[in-house]
């Protein structure tokens, strides 16, 4: 019973039993209510608190404080709880026992890299699709935020006991690919001295000029020696593959990798598009009008029907979405699918739910997370264009300037629905003002203490953690205890910004401990106990950084 989640469940069960005992004694009527507990803002109120008496007051006709005292009288201490108290205007507070806190240090040292793991998912299969940028140009910081959200959620859900696959959906079947191919062929001809115009709907960035030059270096004028339509298609395929490699390299620089790169084209060549359409037609969700094929999403509560095949016979993006989600849920049998999209896809969410329902799938199994964009700043000044290219700044440039760890932390630092400012100068500061430096410096400081202990040949393996008792020591343990709860919270809410807050709070608790308590002293027994605490801190902080996809430096 060394997990904070186990204690949390014990507290909730004890409150439920207290309500039943109070009912049996005629002190309150039979009531059905969800019992919740939370950490008080001030630690002097205990480690957990519930406002249950405030919520029961109206139904029972009793004052909240009277209810708090009644319920508290039926709750026994023990099982990691040393104190149960009441506080105005009607809270019941619970305090962890020192014995449980000290024993947790041993638990952390034993579990090591698996500390924080929980079995919430039970092996349930989850697919997370994110980034999925068109393979027609470099990815930018907006894509970077989606990438970090997706990879961090994958880390967390794996820690929570889910089987997770991370997937990049390659949009390689739409009109944008045709425009890319026409643009590249025009730039290729220009690079060889030919007169060719870049199409109006093409891609006008410098990167296309560079890509064409790369093609000339590798293939010479090979593609001028064949029919233009064949040359344009073949060269375009090579160019698209090269662009995907560049996108993959940029994402790897951000420490983001994928299990699957899924081609949109395969939905059509593999027959899954037709199968999905047949299901919708069989369920009477397909209509023909205005020379187009429509999905009757209004039958499922959407505000309007949606075109899936245009009057010219070409499928829409939504048609591909239908086939893709048929593939996810029915072909590959994922229990849950999470799509991470930019906020500009807000209008697509309701029709996606309707489409999944029309395929005969519970729409609750589909979650779409929308994230807001990032405003890039330098010392408070807005950064609009790249100094290098004069165009929109790429993700690669930001990573090269501030590093992958800083990018990941700042991209996670706000909730997905919040727009965020990313100050490049702040991200590079080596001071406590920079949260990335502050957190990683705590880990480096921990490692320096352990290195010093090793130099002094201090064997702390037999250290007695029951000797710990200073306020700063216990506060640090309390904060370390929260990691499994953070994993549970993020897995339930899909809000990974909680990790960044937790990392800063944990680092702060360690820095305060370091300030208040001398680790290596003349007291050999206390030194060993504190070295155990320091080592446990290393494990928890490194685990937190790992979940965020960041490194844990041993020196800075």
UniProtKB/Swiss-Prot annotation:
Gene Ontology BP annotations: arginyl-tRNA aminoacylation
Keyword Cytoplasm: yes
An annotated Gene Ontology molecular function: ATP binding
UniProt keyword terms in alphabetical order: Aminoacyl-tRNA synthetase, ATP-binding, Cytoplasm, Ligase, Nucleotide-binding, Protein biosynthesis
EC annotation from Swiss-Prot or TrEMBL: 6.1.1.19
Enzyme class, first EC level, given as a word: ligase
Subcellular location: Cytoplasm
Pfam families referenced in this protein's UniProt entry, alphabetically: Arg_tRNA_synt_N, DALR_1, tRNA-synt_1d
Source organism superkingdom: Bacteria
Listed GO CC annotations: cytoplasm
Catalytic function, reaction form: tRNA(Arg) + L-arginine + ATP = L-arginyl-tRNA(Arg) + AMP + diphosphate
Motif interval(s): 'HIGH' region: 133-143
InterPro entries in the record: aa-tRNA-synth_I_CS (IPR001412), Arg-tRNA-ligase (IPR001278), Arg-tRNA-synth_N (IPR005148), Arg-tRNA-synth_N_sf (IPR036695), ArgRS_core (IPR035684), DALR_anticod-bd (IPR008909), Rossmann-like_a/b/a_fold (IPR014729), tRNAsynth_Ia_anticodon-bd (IPR009080)
Assembly notes: Monomer.
Protein family (similarity comment): Belongs to the class-I aminoacyl-tRNA synthetase family.
NCBIfam families linked to this entry: argS (TIGR00456)
Name of the protein in question: Arginine--tRNA ligase
Native species: Dehalococcoides mccartyi (strain CBDB1)
């Amino acid at each position: 019973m060394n997990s904070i989640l186990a204690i949390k469940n014990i507290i909730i069960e004890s409150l439920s039993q207290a309500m039943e005992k109070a009912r049996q004694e005629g002190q309150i009527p039979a009531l059905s209510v969800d019992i919740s507990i939370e950490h008080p803002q001030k630690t002097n109120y205990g480690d957990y608190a519930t406002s249950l008496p405030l919520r029961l007051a109206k139904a029972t006709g009793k004052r909240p404080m009277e209810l708090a005292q009644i319920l508290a009288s039926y709750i026994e201490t023990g099982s990691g709880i040393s104190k149960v108290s009441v506080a105005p205007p009607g809270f019941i507070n619970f305090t962890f026992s020192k014995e449980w806190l000290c024993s947790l240090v041993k638990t952390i040292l034993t579990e090591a890299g698996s500390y924080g793991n929980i079995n919430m998912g039970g092996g349930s299969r989850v697919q997370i699709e994110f980034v999925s940028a068109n393979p027609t140009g470099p990815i930018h910081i907006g894509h970077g935020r989606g990438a970090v959200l997706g990879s961090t959620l994958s880390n967390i859900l794996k820690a929570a006991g889910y089987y997770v696959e991370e997937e990049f959906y390659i949009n390689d079947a739409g009109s944008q690919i045709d425009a890319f191919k026409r643009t590249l062929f025009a730039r290729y001809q220009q690079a060889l001295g030919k007169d060719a115009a870049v199409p109006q709907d093409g891609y006008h960035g410098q990167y296309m000029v560079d890509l064409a030059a790369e093609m000339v270096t590798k293939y010479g004028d090979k593609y001028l020696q064949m029919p233009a339509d064949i040359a344009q298609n073949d060269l375009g395929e090579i160019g698209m593959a090269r662009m995907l490699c560049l996108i993959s390299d940029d994402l790897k620089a951000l420490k983001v990798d994928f299990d699957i790169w899924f081609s949109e084209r395969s939905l059509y060549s593999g027959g899954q598009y037709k199968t999905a359409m047949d299901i919708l037609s069989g369920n009477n969700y397909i209509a023909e009008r205005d020379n187009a094929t429509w999905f009757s999403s209004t039958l499922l509560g959407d505000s309007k029907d949606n075109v899936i095949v245009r009057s010219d016979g070409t499928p829409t993006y939504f048609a591909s979405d239908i086939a893709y989600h048929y593939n996810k849920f029915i072909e590959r049998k994922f229990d849950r699918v999470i799509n991470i999209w930019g906020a500009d896809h807000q209008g697509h969410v309701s029709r996606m739910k309707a489409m999944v329902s029309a395929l005969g799938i519970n729409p609750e199994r589909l979650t779409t997370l929308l994230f807001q964009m990032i405003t890039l700043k330098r010392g408070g000044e807005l950064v609009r264009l790249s100094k290098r290219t004069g165009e929109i700044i790429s993700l690669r440039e930001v990573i090269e300037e501030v590093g992958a760890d800083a990018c990941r932390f700042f991209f996670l630092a706000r909730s997905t629905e919040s727009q965020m400012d990313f100050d490049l100068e702040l991200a590079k500061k080596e001071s406590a003002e920079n949260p990335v430096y502050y957190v990683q410096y705590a880990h480096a400081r921990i490692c320096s203490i352990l290195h010093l202990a090793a130099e002094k040949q201090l064997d702390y393996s037999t250290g007695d953690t029951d000797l710990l008792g200073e306020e700063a020591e216990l506060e640090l343990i309390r904060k370390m205890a929260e990691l499994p709860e953070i994993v549970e919270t993020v897995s339930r809410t899909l809000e990974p910004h909680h990790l960044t807050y937790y990392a800063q709070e944990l680092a702060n608790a360690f820095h305060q401990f370091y300030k208040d308590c001398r680790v290596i002293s003349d007291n050999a027994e206390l030194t060993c106990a504190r070295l155990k605490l320091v080592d446990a801190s290393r494990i928890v902080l490194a685990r937190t950084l790992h979940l965020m996809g960041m490194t844990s430096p041993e020196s800075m």
